Amino acid sequence: MSAAVPTTRAGTPPTLQCGWRSACGKLLDIANYVIFSPEASAVVMPVLVAWECVLLKLIVKHVPYTEIDYLAYMEQIWQINNGERDYSKIEGGTGPLVYPAGHVLIHRLLERATDGLQNVARGQDIFTWLYLLTLVLQFGVYRMLRLPPWCIVLACLSKRLHSVYVLRLFNDGWTTLMMVVAVFLLLLAARHPRLCLPAALVYSAAVSIKMNALLYLPGVLVALFLLTRGHLLALALCGAVAVAWQVLVAADFLSTHPAEYFATAFDFRRQFMYRWSVNWQLVGEQVFSHPTFHRCLLLSHIAILMLFFFTRYAAPRQPNWFRTAAAALRHPATAVLAASPPRAHVAYVLLVSNFIGVLFARSLHYQFLAWYHWTLPALLHWARMPCLLALLWYVLHELCWDTYPPSSVASATLYALNSALLLLLYINGPPA
């Protein structure tokens, strides 16, 4: 008689049961690797780029384009092409030209590419490539920061962001591209300090497109100081390069109407429309428009920046800013810091500075999500939230931006979410 195969109580042979357990264990290991291991990003990122290529084509094909600001951009460019150089007289259907000359340079090229409004489909193609190029460069930043794949996936999940790029053709995407390139170069400069100069140039290009890039300015100054190891002459050279670009790109306007250019292109007193404010529907329109409210936001912005500056931004090995500054002033042609900071520290300084500015911005319109959405994967990772809690945070954040028209509940929720994230970023400090 043949021996009977031993079975478990459930009637399953032990060898088969062990096989199932082994297979399940391997699947769990693979899932854990793909979700949490930074090394898996080399596999996840190409898949996400391919997915975005398909998704963007489907969006453009099946969702109608909505005209909001692109016509106004073209009307302003037509006036410039006709010889107008007084910025205070250049207007479009939605108001005056309030963007610096880098915006004009880009949209002159776009006006040719799209033949004004005759070929908006080509413009959508250009903005599709703009989105994808920005995404690939973002992924380069994430790779250097060793973000886990679950964070990286968040960069591709915003319905609002896809709309801003390929269905609205807002200019915010161009500023974001320049800022991502600038951050990318500054992270590389942690090992190759000579890249500080091109980083300063690209940052200046971002500012010349739209002023929101100035939210990064405190972080950029700190990062350049740390990356040049406190070498003040090197820092001054970076500043000179940045200023030179501003003069060069605006030369046509500065040579004829300089006062009008600065007053209009860099108008810090500009009034925003309350009805489109995503972040301040929780206050009344009278409060929103009152100068005292604006001053309170500015003072709060400065106070929080100072808190981070003195307690979180200093060089890891030399935390006393006063001693560092004194040494730099005594020896402006000498590097006074022992070493360049780690890449993660540079990124923390840059991205948190921008996020603080977003939190205290006088208004956030729907397209302004592009200012900081790309930084959320890194910020959520540094906040050290559990994965599921971070995903919940992201979903709620996206719902706030997808609420139309803006509501007081969505505004209050958005402010609470962003405040909680900033608090966690402060508590946990720069990543090691």
Swiss-Prot record:
Membrane topology: Multi-pass membrane protein
Ranges facing Lumenal side: 1-124, 190-206, 252-290, 365-375, 430-432
Enzyme Commission number(s): 2.4.1.258
Leader peptide range in chain numbering: none
PANTHER family reported for this sequence: DOL-P-MAN:MAN(5)GLCNAC(2)-PP-DOL ALPHA-1,3-MANNOSYLTRANSFERASE, NOT56 - RELATED
InterPro entries: Glycosyltransferase_ALG3
Family to which the UniProt record says this protein belongs: Belongs to the glycosyltransferase ALG3 family.
Domain of life (superkingdom): Eukaryota
Chain segments annotated as coiled-coil in the UniProt record: none
Organism: Eremothecium gossypii (strain ATCC 10895 / CBS 109.51 / FGSC 9923 / NRRL Y-1056) (Yeast)
CC annotations in GO: endoplasmic reticulum; endoplasmic reticulum membrane
Magnesium among keywords: no
Transmembrane intervals: 125-145, 169-189, 207-227, 231-251, 291-311, 344-364, 376-396, 409-429
Protein name (database record): Dol-P-Man:Man(5)GlcNAc(2)-PP-Dol alpha-1,3-mannosyltransferase
Record keyword Transferase present: yes
Localisation: Endoplasmic reticulum membrane
Pathway connected to this protein: Protein modification; protein glycosylation
One Pfam family this sequence matches: ALG3
Enzyme class: transferase
Annotated keywords: Endoplasmic reticulum, Glycosyltransferase, Membrane, Transferase, Transmembrane, Transmembrane helix
MF terms in GO: dol-P-Man:Man(5)GlcNAc(2)-PP-Dol alpha-1,3-mannosyltransferase activity
Catalyzed chemical reaction(s): an alpha-D-Man-(1->2)-alpha-D-Man-(1->2)-alpha-D-Man-(1->3)-[alpha-D-Man-(1->6)]-beta-D-Man-(1->4)-beta-D-GlcNAc-(1->4)-alpha-D-GlcNAc-diphospho-di-trans,poly-cis-dolichol + a di-trans,poly-cis-dolichyl beta-D-mannosyl phosphate = an alpha-D-Man-(1->2)-alpha-D-Man-(1->2)-alpha-D-Man-(1->3)-[alpha-D-Man-(1->3)-alpha-D-Man-(1->6)]-beta-D-Man-(1->4)-beta-D-GlcNAc-(1->4)-alpha-D-GlcNAc-diphospho-di-trans,poly-cis-dolichol + a di-trans,poly-cis-dolichyl phosphate + H(+)
